[in-house]
Amino acid sequence: MGLVPHVAENINGSDQMTSLFDRELVKNRTIYISGPIDSATALLAVAKLYYLSDISDDPITIIFVDCPGGSVTAGWAIYDAIQNVACEVSTVCMGMCASMGAFLLASGTKGKRIVTPNSEVMIHQPSAGTQGMVTDMEINIEHFQRVKRRINATLAKHTGKSEKQIKKDSERDHWMSAEEAVAYGLADEIDYGAQRRECD
């Protein structure tokens, strides 16, 4: 996330510049995930999720996701945090949720997974590469297959599709409109305005 907007706020009687994302984090329990998912992105998202879970009994946290994909292991870290925090987690796709981004969209609390009207969602099989000795490559390929099966099983759990269907659809890039993502079970509704009003 390159440019971070700042706003002036009166804190303890003095005007201070505050990151808009930090302000939204505390005021509206909102987290933003933008760009490819890596270990740094995951660390921030997980820390914010647990922080919000600890400081308040508020029943919901919102994660806005605009993501082309990224590291599977980093994505799993965010996924586990979403599943483990006490509050419900509403995931909102803004722009694009592809690959691991789509996985995180689907991982939100059932009934609270939202896509904005012009969003695009894409699932596919994980990509990976291997090199070295043949035996090591065979070990790595088997590991990649296990990862693929685990992702398919998890997507099946969250979408209501069969693992066989998920496997078939994700063999190649499978793009969906907002309407198609809802029909597929990756999201529950197309509704941006109502989600913002819920914070007020």
PLM regions with names:
Residues 1-200:
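Terminal-region recognition feature
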